[in-house]
């Protein structure tokens, strides 16, 4: 006599027996009917039970496919748990990018490459995800790669997407969740990707290579772009439309940075083959300041944060005011800079130098758009020049502490510059040079601060601000090169 299963209930056992007979019925031929009848008897199934509707068609096959789907779901969930566990470890482990020492705020890579990710083509741009342990890079062949820092195998990307038909020149993430990704290309398009990295929008309008893109710091639905067609464009990515376009330079626009003002809206800093950088007010399209002094193409520009950098440079200028006779002494303490949200910027050029500028504040008139600065003929003041690279300086990044400037060059090196040198020696020199790439350095990225847990509008002191930065800082730094590789530096 057949023993009843100890795992299944009586009803489940009965359903299974019926499903077995149901599955075998169309398989068994006339000659095997005797075997089928004997099996039906052994399983204690009446023939009338199989004629009714108490068991669905193809019951056994459907159960089997359900089990397979559940097994796949379990594997996916186990992988997700593994990734989330690694993310937690990444947040709490020094070896995964977080330094627990008291000097974390001044962390820079020691110079050894922790991981190398190899692509099939020149790496043109790189970005770290704002929140997840993911590295993104765009290549000259139009491919977008996504690498997971927690994976043991660094030879296989998490994902590879044929994003564009020509080179991906730059990419950027929005500043708030959900984190949108924007990529721009020599195929004249900009593409928008959602938080799961699905393509959701293509922006058309530029008439030549799109060089760089940047999300508005104040609105994740607004994107800015610059192009070889000399135009600066403002996009609404939710609608996929261009809201504004204005000519920023007389030649190819190479790069841009954006900052949000408390009362005046956004400002963008752009640079060009015309050897200049320009500050523009987005809402009006008016150019309010120019930065002239480079002797070759200006490849990259960055605003400096209001912490540390401002204090160090202010102190240097104040102590050496005789070197800057055209800077009004009262200007450095003018509260207009607090309202604007910017004061200093840096630019990098093919003349092998980086220049530090004091930005002349635009003229503010109530109920009107900002006008060109009344100071210094709207020209930025050159405060310092960083010399040390032996070839074109292609890319810039600003350390979260605000006082380190990071540069990548065609001389295959990455340099870290300390603004403290202005106070100590009157000049800015490289405190660290790292090398390891075998080709030009095309892009670099220092991990963005994690989202703030505080919702307070309280004005922080410099010390409180630095403590908050240190708490939210991720010690991750990457570079992308013409040698087809991305390096994560430890």
Swiss-Prot record:
Its main location: cytoplasm. The keyword Transport applies. GO terms for molecular function: dynein complex binding. One of its GO terms (biological process) is establishment of mitotic spindle orientation. WD repeats lie at residues 118-157, 163-204, 205-245, 251-290, 293-327, 328-367, 388-427, 436-487. It holds the Pfam family WD40. One of its GO terms (cellular component) is microtubule associated complex. Residues 65-96 form a coiled coil. It is found in: Cytoplasm, Cytoskeleton; Cytoplasm, Cytoskeleton, Spindle pole. InterPro entries: Dynein_regulator_LIS1, G-protein_beta_WD-40_rep, LIS1_N, WD40/YVTN_repeat-like_dom_sf, WD40_repeat_CS, WD40_repeat_dom_sf, WD40_rpt, WD_LIS1/nudF_dynein_reg. Keywords: Cell cycle, Cell division, Coiled coil, Cytoplasm, Cytoskeleton, Microtubule, Mitosis, Repeat, Transport, WD repeat. SMART domains: WD40. Positively regulates the activity of the minus-end directed microtubule motor protein dynein. Plays a central role in positioning the mitotic spindle at the bud neck during cell division. Targets cytoplasmic dynein to microtubule plus ends, thereby promoting dynein-mediated microtubule sliding along the bud cortex and consequently the movement of the mitotic spindle to the bud neck. Self-associates. Interacts with NDL1 and dynein. Belongs to the WD repeat LIS1/nudF family. This is Nuclear distribution protein PAC1. It comes from Candida tropicalis (strain ATCC MYA-3404 / T1) (Yeast).
């Amino acid at each position: 006599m057949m023993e009843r299963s100890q795992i299944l209930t009586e009803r489940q056992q009965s359903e299974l027996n019926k499903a077995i007979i149901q599955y075998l019925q169309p398989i068994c031929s006339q000659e095997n009917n005797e075997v089928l009848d004997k099996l039906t008897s052994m399983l204690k199934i009446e023939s009338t039970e199989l004629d009714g509707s108490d068991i669905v068609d193809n019951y056994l096959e459907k159960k089997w496919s359900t089990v397979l789907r559940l097994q796949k779901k379990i594997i996916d969930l186990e992988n997700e748990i593994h990734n989330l566990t690694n993310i937690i470890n990444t947040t709490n482990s020094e070896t995964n990018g977080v330094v627990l020492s008291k000097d974390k705020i001044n962390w820079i890579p020691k110079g050894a490459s922790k991981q190398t990710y190899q692509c099939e083509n020149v790496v043109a741009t790189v970005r770290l995800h704002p929140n997840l342990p993911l590295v993104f890079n765009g290549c000259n062949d139009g491919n977008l790669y996504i690498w997971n820092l927690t994976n043991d195998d660094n030879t296989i990307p998490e994902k590879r997407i044929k994003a564009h038909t020509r080179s991906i020149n730059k990419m950027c993430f929005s500043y708030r969740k959900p984190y949108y990704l924007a990529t721009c290309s020599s195929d004249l398009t900009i593409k928008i990707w959602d938080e799961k990295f699905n393509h959701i929008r293509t922006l058309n309008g530029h008439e030549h290579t799109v060089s760089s893109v940047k999300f508005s710091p104040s609105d994740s639905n607004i994107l800015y772009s610059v192009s070889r067609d000399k135009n600066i464009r403002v996009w609404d990515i939710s609608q996929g439309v261009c809201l504004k376009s204005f000519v920023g330079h007389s030649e190819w626009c190479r790069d841009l940075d954006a900052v949000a003002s408390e009362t005046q809206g956004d400002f963008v800093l752009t640079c060009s083959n015309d050897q200049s950088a320009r500050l523009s007010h987005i809402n009006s399209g008016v150019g309010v300041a120019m930065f002239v002094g480079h002797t070759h193409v200006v490849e990259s520009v960055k605003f400096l944060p209001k912490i540390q950098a401002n204090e160090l440079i202010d102190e240097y200028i104040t102590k050496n005011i005789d070197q800057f006779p055209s800077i009004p002494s009262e200007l450095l303490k003018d509260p207009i800079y607090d309202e604007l949200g910017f004061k200093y910027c840096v630019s990098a050029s093919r003349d092998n130098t980086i220049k530090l500028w004091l930005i002349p504040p635009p003229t503010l008139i109530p109920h009107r758009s900002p006008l060109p600065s009344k100071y210094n003929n709207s020209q930025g003041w050159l405060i310092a020049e960083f010399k040390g690279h032996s070839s074109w300086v292609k890319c810039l990044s600003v350390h979260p502490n605000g006082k380190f400037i990071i540069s990548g060059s065609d001389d295959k090196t990455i340099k870290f510059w300390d603004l403290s040198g202005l106070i100590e020696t009157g000049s800015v020199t490289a405190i660290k040079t790292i090398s390891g790439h075998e080709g030009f350095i095309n892009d670099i990225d220092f991990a963005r601060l994690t989202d703030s847990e505080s919702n307070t509008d309280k004005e922080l002191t410099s010390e409180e601000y630095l403590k908050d930065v240190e708490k939210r800082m991720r010690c991750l730094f990457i570079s992308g090169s013409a040698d087809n590789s991305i390096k994560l530096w430890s």
